[in-house]
Each structure stands twice: as C-alpha cells, then as structure tokens.
Regions:
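Pore- or pathway-lining transmembrane helices of multi-pass membrane proteins that form conduits
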Residues: 11-20, 154-175
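Membrane-interfacial helix-loop-helix junctions in multi-pass membrane proteins
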Residues: 35-39, 121, 171-231
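Short cytosolic juxtamembrane segments of multi-pass membrane proteins
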Residues: 240-248
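Aromatic- and glycine-rich beta-strand/loop motifs that create alpha-glucan
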Residues: 1-17, 245-246
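Alpha-helical transmembrane segments and their short interhelical loops
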Residues: 86-163, 213-237
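Residue-level recognition of transmembrane alpha-helices
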Residues: 14-15, 47, 51, 70, ...
Length: 248
C-alpha cells in the first residue's frame, strides 16, 4: 500500500479518470440522450454505480501489476524464501490491493453523492453500509482474479492486455452505462452471467433505485458476489507465483 500512496500519478489517475468520466459523459448524455427507464433520477446519478465498479477494476489492475516489479527486482523471491508460506505472502499482497480498491471506490462514491440525486431508499447510513459491503466483495473478487492472472502471465504488458480483454467487455455489459432490462435476449443473457452486473445492481439499489427497480434483487446480488469473491480469491491464493521467465 505504501508504494501506491507514494506513486501519486497512479493514485490520482486511477481516481480522477472515473470521476472525469462521470462528469463529462454523465452531463453530456443527460442533455437529451439519456436512456429510457433509468433507475435513477438522471443519467449522471445512474452512472455512479458503474464508475465505482470501474474504479475497482482500475485499482485491481494497477495493484496486481506491482507483482512484476517485485518479481523482476528479486523482492518476491526474497519474500517467498522467508518462513512465511507462499499463500501468506500472496494474501498480504492481495489484501493490500483490496484495501486500496475499497478506499478508492468509497472515495469516488462519497465525492459523487453530494452532486447527484440519490434516493437512499434504506436511509443514508444503511445505504452507505450496503454500498461499502458491495465494494468490499467486488474488490476481493477482482483482486483474486488479478492475482491468479499475474502469477501466470509472463509480462506486465500481457497482464494488462488480458485484464482489459477480460474485464472491459464485462464492464460494458454489466448495466454500468445503460440499463440491462428490455435488451435483446442475447445481451440479457450476458448480463445475467456477468459477475460485475451483480455489483452494479447492488450499488444501484443501495444508492438510488427503489426496491422493485433492481435487475436481480439485493439478496441475489450479495449471494452471487459472496460466492464468487470467496471462490476467485481462493483461486488467486492457490496459484504458486512464477519467479522467472521460464516459470520456475
């Protein structure tokens, strides 16, 4: 975590990019181009859930990319030669990534809240609690996925390519930028099998959608996110990291 806080360019860019996306796209589309049947009062408010998920995606990618710096500098080999097990080392690194992602996602949500029309159907504090729990589960899942990929993809460039190829299509078909109900059947199927859809839906229900407006429902959202977070995070910890280009 200290390395990320010292890298101001990484810290600021991973938070400012989603916020700028929210400001310019939200205000631009709100002027006459907003999709119908929004669960929020306006398109800017609707985008907040997707922007928080986008922040978590950026954070997981950037945090896990530090694996390559540690590997190439010999730090990872030194850590793995310590009395601690490989899983303990990976747990510490991934936990730091989870904490950073949760912090950044929460900051984006809190910065956006005063400027958009949130309904807080459960009340402000319970709504924030639901949103925070969603952000935590989302970042656990993303951190596990990023850790599993980083331990197998040889180069940082390849890692970023695989992460972008895997996550950005999921982000676009998650309801982050347009409602997923009343879409063609094949898009609705993609939304239902998309893990990010459940995070977006839970954040929408926490902040501005009423109880009947959620695509899946809060209970289903948390059940899916909890199972996926546990399974994917366990997979990330189970992958033995490669220390050399040959994989040894």
């Amino acid at each position: 975590m200290r390395a990320v806080t010292r890298s101001r360019s990484q810290l600021y860019s991973s938070m400012l990019t989603p916020l700028l996306f929210l400001v310019f796209l939200g205000n631009g589309v709100s002027e006459g181009l907003a999709p119908a049947n929004l669960t929020a009062g306006n398109f800017t408010a609707y985008l907040v859930a997707g922007v928080v998920v986008m922040t978590s995606v950026f954070s997981a990618t950037f945090s896990s990319a530090s694996y390559y710096k540690d590997r190439d500098s010999g730090i990872l080999r030194m850590l793995l030669s310590s009395p601690n097990s490989a899983r303990t080392v990976l747990f510490g690194k991934s936990l730091a990534g989870v904490c950073i992602g949760v912090l950044q996602g929460s900051v984006v949500l809190l910065l956006a809240a005063p400027f958009v029309e949130f309904e807080w159907q459960y009340g402000v504090l319970p709504g924030l609690g639901v949103a925070l729990a969603t952000i935590v589960l989302l970042n656990i899942m993303l951190s596990g996925l990023a850790q599993a990929l980083a331990s197998r993809v040889e180069t940082m460039q390849g890692f970023h390519l695989v992460m972008n190829l895997a996550l950005f299509p999921l982000l676009f078909f998650s309801g982050a930028f347009f409602p997923v109900d009343n879409l063609p059947m094949w898009l609705e199927v993609l939304a239902r099998i998309n893990p990010l859809s459940y995070a977006v839906d839970a954040l929408e229900l926490a902040a501005y959608a009423d109880g009947t407006a959620g695509f899946f429902g809060l209970a289903v959202d948390f059940a899916v996110l909890t199972v996926l977070a546990a399974a994917v995070y366990a997979l990330g910890l189970a992958r033995t990291p490669r220390l050399t280009w040959s994989g040894k």
